[in-house]
From Swiss-Prot:
The gene is iHog. Residues 45-142, 155-232, 252-340, 346-432 form the Ig-like C2-type domain. Residues 725-880 are cytoplasmic. Mediates response to the active Hedgehog (Hh) protein signal in embryos, functioning upstream or at the level of patched (ptc). Residues 665-678 have a biased composition (Polar residues). It is a single-pass type I membrane protein. The first fibronectin type-III domain mediates a specific interaction with Hh protein, in vitro. The second fibronectin type-III domain is additionally required for in vivo signaling activity. Residues 21-703 are extracellular. Residues 823-837, 864-880 have a biased composition (Low complexity). This is Interference hedgehog. It is found in: Membrane. The keyword Transmembrane helix applies. It comes from Drosophila simulans. The chain crosses the membrane at residues 704-724. The lineage of its organism: Eukaryota, Metazoa, Ecdysozoa, Arthropoda, Hexapoda. Glycans are attached at residues 102, 209, 466, 557, 693.
Length: 880
C-alpha cells in the first residue's frame, strides 16, 4: 500500500471524536489519581496486539517464522524491517512475496517467513491497519547464532588441585566462551560425561563433599543450542583427593585459579544459584548473609545447600552483595563476596493519555516506564516515528506536540525498550478541526442588517460519525456539531452505504431532533443514534445529514470503513454492574457502577447508558460516557419526582458488551419552602406541596386522629341533611304520592275558612309554565282575550264573610282563572276532561252540602323553596 493511500485513510479520522451526548455531565465526586496510579489506556480504540513477534536466534541459511496476532481481525497486516547493518536507519515496509520475506494471513494472525541471511538480520515489526488506525507491535530481533572463545590462546597447562576429603570444589570452566544464545555445558571426568549436581551454573563445575573417588582429570564442552555447534575448551583440571586424617590443619583458603569475588547478572523471574569457593582442613562450615538485602537468605524462595545458595523467582530487590563466610576453627576465616545484578524487562506503568484536542493546541503526553537497565522511551504517531515530525519534541518521558495538526489524529504509541525487550502502550488522539470561515467580500465595512436574520448565515456540517458495533446487525453512531454561530439545525438523518461497486447510499427513517439550541460543552454538542438491519461480515461507511432551519441540508464527511464482525468472532466485553442510582437533584440522578476485578479496562472505550421512565414502555434514551476509568456519571435533565429505570453496557470501537441488570432510581421531590407563607385572601388557595418527609413521616396516632375526625364530620353532615329533607317532606304534605291534580287543588283554600293571620300571604301566586307543545295556541288565546273582555263565563254566586275589599280582590282573581280555564278548554279538547273533573268536583261539593254557602277556592301560598313546573304534563291551567 502506498503512502498516498495510507494518508487518505488517515484523513478520514481527522475529525472523528468520542463525546458524551448533551444530557450528560461529569459527576462532581470523582476520585483523584494518586501519584503512583497508572492511567488506563483512554480512549482505547478497542484493538491491541495480543501476541507480538518474538526475538529469534538462528543459524545462517535457516528459515524462521515470526507470528503476530491482534485482538480483532484487521483490514490488512504489514511488516517493517530495520537491518542490523544500518542500526541508525529507520524501518522500511517489506515487499511481500519476495525471496527473503513471505507474509501470510489467517484471520487475526499474520506470519512472516524469513530466510536467515546477513541482509535479513535486524529488527522486525508487525503493523495492523484498522481503517485509519495503525497499531504497531513491539520489536523482534533476528540474530545469527554464534559460539566463540574470548581469547584464543595456546592451551594452558592443566590445573593441579589437591584437597582433603569432605571439601567442596568449584571449577570455573567456561569463563572464556561467548555464545549466542547461551551455551549448554557438558562435563567429563577421565573422558566420561558426568551429570553435574547443579544445572544452570553457566560453565561452573561444582563438586560437593568430594572423596577419593572424585579424583581424576576433568574437562568441559560448550554447545550452541541454536546451531548445534560444539567447542571443546582447552583447559582441564587434575583433582587429587586425600584422606582427611592425613591432612594437616589449614584455615579456609582459595585454590589456584579460583576467583576472589564474583559478579553475576540474572533476569528477573529466573532462578539464581550462588556457589562459594574455598577449601580447608578440616572442611569449613559456610554461613550466607547479605548486608544489602533484608531477609535474602531466610525466606520461602531461598534454599541453602552448604556452599550453594539458590534463590527462585528472582526479583529486582534481590539485587545486592551476598557474603559467603567460611570457618573451620582455624584462623583466619574466609569471606567471599558475590555481587548480584537483577535485570528487568521494561514495563510501562503510566501510559499516555490523550483527550479530545483542538487543532492548533499544544499537547503534552507522558509515558512512564520501569525496567533495569533504565528503558529508553520512543514514540510512534500512527506508525510513524515522532523524530520525523517537525511539531514533536521529546523531553525525558514526555512527547510534546507544539501544534496539533489533523495528521496527528489516530493512534499514538509509547515504547519502552532495553536490552531485555520492549513494551508499548497507546492512546487514541482525537483532533477537533478548526472551522473554516468563508471570506467576506472586501470593499467597505460590513454592518449586519437586523432585518436579514439568518439569511446569510453559514451551514456548519456535523463531524464524521464514530462507529461502534452493538450486535451482529446494528451499530451505534456518535458525532458532534462543533460550536458555531451558523444556521440552527432542526433534525439529523443517518445515511449508510455498503462498501463495493454500485452501492448506493441509504437513509434511515428516523428523524433525530437537534433538541435545545444550546451547547453542552465548550467544543459543541454531541449526539448518538443506532442503525439496524445491517449484514454481518460486510464493510460499511456512514455519514450524517443535517437539515437546517432554512430547509436546506448539508452532509458530514464519511466515516472510516467499518467491518461488522459477527459476535462469535469477538471476545466478550466486560459487563458493568450498576451499584446505585443516587438522587442528585430534582432533575438529575448520578449513576454508580463497577467492573469485575478481572475485567480488562484496556478493551473499553466508554459506556452507553440507557434510561426511560418506569411507567413508559417506549424506547430508551441513550447517553454516552467516555473513558474506561469512569465509575459515576450525572444524567440531566429529568422529570421531577419521577421513577426511571437504567441499564449500562461498555463499548469499544468494534463491539459492545451485554447489558447490565436493570436498576430503578428516581429524582428528588420538590422541596417545601421554609419561609412564612402570606395570608390567603378570598378566592386564593394554598398550593404548597409538602416535602417528602412531611408526606410520608407522619406518626400513626396523628394519622388515626385526623381520619376519625373526618369520619365524624361526614356523619354529622349526613345527619343534618337527612333531618332537613324529612322536615321539607312533612311541610309538603303527608302523602307524597297523591296525584298532581289533587296537589294543585290543595294549593287553593276556601276564602271563608281563611284565617286573618294568613292574609299577608295571599299576594304570593304560583307560576305555571304552559306545555311547550301548546305555547303557540296559548299565545293566540291570550291575544283573543285581550280583544274580547266581555266574553260570557259561568260562576256560582259566592258569599264572603269578611272584608269587602278582600271580596273584590278574590272575585277578580277567580274571574281571571275561570277565563283562563274556558280558553284552554276551547282550544285544546284533550284537556276538557281534566277541567270538567275539576269543575265537577267543585259542584259535587256544593250538592253534598246544600245548606252551606258555596266554596270559593283561592290560591294557597307555597314555600319559596319549591318551584312548580307543569310544562311536562297535559294540564295547562287551573280550574275553579
Amino acid at each position: 500500500m502506498t503512502l498516498l493511500t495510507s494518508s487518505l485513510l488517515l484523513f478520514s479520522l481527522l475529525t472523528s471524536r468520542l463525546e458524551a451526548i448533551p444530557v450528560l455531565e461529569k459527576s462532581p465526586a470523582h476520585p483523584a489519581h494518586s501519584a503512583h496510579t497508572a492511567h488506563p489506556a483512554h480512549p482505547s480504540p478497542g484493538v491491541r496486539i495480543l501476541r507480538a513477534p518474538e526475538s529469534l536466534v538462528a543459524p545462517l541459511g535457516d528459515e524462521v517464522v515470526l507470528e503476530c496476532e491482534t485482538s480483532l481481525q484487521p483490514e490488512r497486516f504489514e511488516w517493517s524491517h530495520r537491518s542490523s547493518r544500518s542500526p541508525g536507519a529507520g524501518f522500511k515496509y517489506l515487499r511481500t512475496g519476495t525471496a527473503k520475506a513471505n507474509v501470510s494471513q489467517e484471520a487475526a494472525i499474520s506470519r512472516l517467513r524469513v530466510l536467515v541471511r546477513p541482509d535479513t538480520l535486524g529488527e522486525y515489526r508487525c503493523v495492523g491497519w484498522f481503517g485509519p488506525l495503525v497499531v504497531t507491535s513491539t520489536t523482534a530481533r533476528l540474530e545469527l547464532a554464534s559460539t566463540s572463545l574470548v581469547d584464543a590462546q595456546e592451551p594452558e597447562s592443566p590445573l593441579q588441585w589437591r584437597v582433603s576429603a569432605g571439601n567442596s570444589v568449584l571449577w570455573s570452566c567456561g569463563q572464556q566462551v561467548q555464545s549466542n544464545p547461551s551455551a549448554s555445558w557438558s562435563y567429563f571426568r577421565n573422558g566420561v560425561e558426568i551429570k553435574p549436581e547443579f544445572i544452570g551454573t553457566n560453565g561452573n563445575l561444582f563438586l560437593s563433599n568430594v572423596s577419593s573417588e572424585s579424583s581424576g582429570s576433568y574437562s568441559c564442552q560448550a554447545t550452541n543450542p541454536a546451531s548445534g555447534e560444539r567447542i571443546q575448551l582447552p583447559g582441564s583440571l587434575q583433582l587429587q583427593v586425600t584422606p582427611e586424617q592425613r591432612s594437616q590443619s589449614k584455615s579456609p583458603h582459595l585454590l589456584k585459579g579460583q576467583p576472589s569475588s564474583q559478579e553475576i547478572t540474572i533476569r528477573e523471574g529466573s532462578s539464581l544459584l550462588l556457589l562459594c569457593p574455598g577449601v580447608g582442613s578440616p572442611p569449613p562450615t559456610v554461613v550466607w548473609s547479605s548486608p544489602d538485602v533484608v531477609g535474602a537468605v531466610k525466606n520461602k524462595r531461598s534454599k541453602v545447600f552448604g556452599h550453594a545458595l539458590e534463590i527462585s523467582n528472582t526479583r529486582v530487590h534481590d539485587a545486592g552483595t551476598y557474603i559467603c563466610f567460611q570457618d573451620n576453627g582455624v584462623r583466619p576465616a574466609l569471606e567471599h563476596y558475590i555481587k548480584v545484578h537483577v535485570e528487568q524487562p521494561p514495563q510501562i506503568v503510566r501510559p499516555p493519555w490523550a483527550d479530545l484536542t483542538n487543532e492548533g493546541d499544544r499537547l503534552k503526553l507522558e509515558c512512564e516506564a520501569t525496567g533495569v537497565p533504565t528503558p529508553e522511551i520512543y514514540w510512534l504517531l500512527n506508525g510513524h516515528s515522532s523524530i520525523d515530525d517537525t511539531e514533536a519534541e521529546l523531553s525525558n518521558n514526555f512527547l510534546i506536540l507544539h501544534s496539533v495538526l489533523k495528521r496527528h489524529a489516530g493512534y499514538v504509541q509509547c515504547f519502552a525498550r532495553n536490552r531485555l525487550g520492549e513494551h508499548s502502550a497507546g492512546t487514541l488522539l482525537q483532533v477537533n478541526p478548526k472551522q473554516i470561515q468563508e471570506p467576506r467580500e472586501s470593499g467597505g465595512t460590513h454592518r449586519p442588517n437586523p432585518n436579514q436574520g439568518s439569511k446569510h448565515k453559514q451551514m456548519y456540517p456535523p463531524t464524521p460519525p464514530n462507529v461502534t458495533r452493538l450486535t451482529d446487525e446494528s451499530v451505534m453512531l456518535r458525532w458532534m456539531v462543533p460550536r458555531n454561530d451558523g444556521l440552527p439545525i432542526v433534525i439529523f438523518k443517518v445515511q449508510y452505504r455498503m462498501v463495493g461497486k454500485r452501492k448506493n447510499w441509504q437513509t434511515t427513517n428516523d428523524n433525530i431532533p437537534y433538541g435545545k439550541p444550546k451547547w453542552n460543552s465548550e467544543l459543541g454538542k454531541s449526539f448518538t443514534a443506532s442503525v439496524t438491519d445491517l449484514k454481518p461480515e460486510h464493510t460499511y461507511r456512514f455519514r450524517i445529514l443535517a437539515v437546517y432551519s432554512n430547509n436546506d441540508n448539508k452532509e458530514s464527511n464519511t466515516s472510516a470503513k467499518f467491518y461488522l464482525q459477527p459476535g462469535a468472532a469477538l471476545d466478550p466485553m466486560p459487563v458493568p454492574e450498576l451499584l446505585e442510582i443516587e438522587e442528585y437533584s430534582e432533575t438529575a440522578v448520578v449513576l454508580h457502577w463497577s467492573l469485575a476485578s478481572d475485567a480488562d479496562e484496556h478493551l473499553i472505550t466508554g459506556y452507553y447508558a440507557y434510561y426511560r421512565p418506569s411507567s413508559s414502555a417506549g424506547e430508551y434514551f441513550k447517553a454516552t460516557i467516555e473513558g474506561a476509568h469512569a465509575r459515576s456519571f450525572k444524567i440531566a435533565p429529568l422529570e421531577t419526582a419521577t421513577m426511571y429505570e437504567f441499564k449500562l453496557q461498555s463499548f469499544s470501537a468494534v463491539s459492545a458488551s451485554e447489558f447490565s441488570a436493570l436498576k430503578q432510581g428516581r429524582t428528588q421531590r420538590p422541596k417545601t419552602s421554609t419561609t412564612e407563607e402570606p395570608t390567603l385572601q378570598m378566592g386564593d388557595r394554598d398550593t404548597t406541596t409538602p416535602s417528602h418527609n412531611e408526606t410520608f413521616n407522619m406518626s400513626p396516632m396523628l394519622t388515626g386522629t385526623i381520619g376519625g375526625g373526618a369520619v365524624l364530620i361526614l356523619l354529622l353532615i349526613s345527619t343534618c341533611l337527612c333531618v332537613c329533607r324529612r322536615r321539607n317532606s312533612r311541610s309538603r304534605g303527608n302523602n307524597p304520592n297523591k296525584p298532581r291534580m289533587a296537589e294543585l287543588r290543595d294549593d287553593f283554600v276556601p276564602l271563608g275558612n281563611c284565617s286573618p293571620t294568613k292574609q299577608r300571604q295571599r299576594t304570593r301566586h304560583i307560576h305555571i309554565t304552559l306545555n311547550p307543545l301548546a305555547q303557540q295556541q296559548q299565545q293566540a288565546l291570550e291575544e283573543k282575550n285581550d280583544t274580547d273582555q266581555d266574553a260570557p263565563y259561568y260562576q256560582r254566586p259566592s258569599s264572603y264573610d269578611y272584608d269587602p275589599a278582600l271580596r273584590r280582590m278574590s272575585s277578580s282573581s277567580l274571574r281571571r282563572s275561570q277565563r283562563t280555564l274556558e280558553r284552554a278548554g276551547g282550544s285544546n279538547g284533550s284537556n276538557n276532561g281534566n277541567n270538567n273533573n275539576l269543575n265537577q268536583t267543585a259542584e259535587a261539593g256544593a250538592v253534598e252540602n246544600p245548606g252551606k254557602p258555596g266554596r270559593v277556592l283561592m290560591k294557597r301560598p307555597r314555600l319559596s323553596s319549591r318551584s312548580e313546573n307543569l310544562s311536562s304534563g297535559s294540564l295547562n291551567s287551573v280550574g275553579v
